[in-house]
């Protein structure tokens, strides 16, 4: 395994660890999820470049589209929750409430 792959895997696991540690705040969780998507994008790009297959080149682009949709939905939810409740604490949200 090359040093670049090791660094990218470490970045992914640190983002995953950050998601587990900072799960009480929605903004911190969204930032860690974006870090995870960025490392997955870099890993898929490196895999596509090493495989020399033209079909593999579409996977990073599709992943970027899903990451952009995830970021937009996450920021919209964050804005709605912070306007409604005044905070981004996940513990204050009751998802069973209608």
UniProtKB/Swiss-Prot annotation:
The keyword Membrane applies. It is a multi-pass membrane protein. It comes from the Eukaryota. One of its GO terms (biological process) is ATP synthesis coupled electron transport. This is NADH-ubiquinone oxidoreductase chain 4L. One of its GO terms (molecular function) is NADH dehydrogenase (ubiquinone) activity. Pfam families: Oxidored_q2. Core subunit of respiratory chain NADH dehydrogenase (Complex I) which is composed of 45 different subunits. It comes from Calomys laucha (Small vesper mouse). Gene3D superfamilies: 1.10.287.3510. Belongs to the complex I subunit 4L family. The chain crosses the membrane at residues 2-22, 29-49, 61-81. It catalyses: a ubiquinone + NADH + 5 H(+)(in) = a ubiquinol + NAD(+) + 4 H(+)(out).
């Amino acid at each position: 395994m090359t040093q670049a792959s090791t660094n990218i895997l470490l970045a992914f696991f640190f983002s995953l660890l950050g998601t587990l540690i900072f799960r009480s705040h929605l903004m911190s969780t969204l930032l860690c999820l974006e870090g995870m998507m960025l490392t997955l994008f870099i890993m898929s790009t490196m895999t596509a470049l090493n495989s020399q297959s033209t079909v593999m080149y579409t996977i990073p682009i599709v992943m970027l589209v899903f990451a952009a949709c995830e970021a937009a939905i996450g920021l919209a939810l964050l804005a709605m929750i912070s306007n409604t409740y005044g905070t981004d604490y996940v513990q204050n949200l009751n998802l069973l409430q209608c």
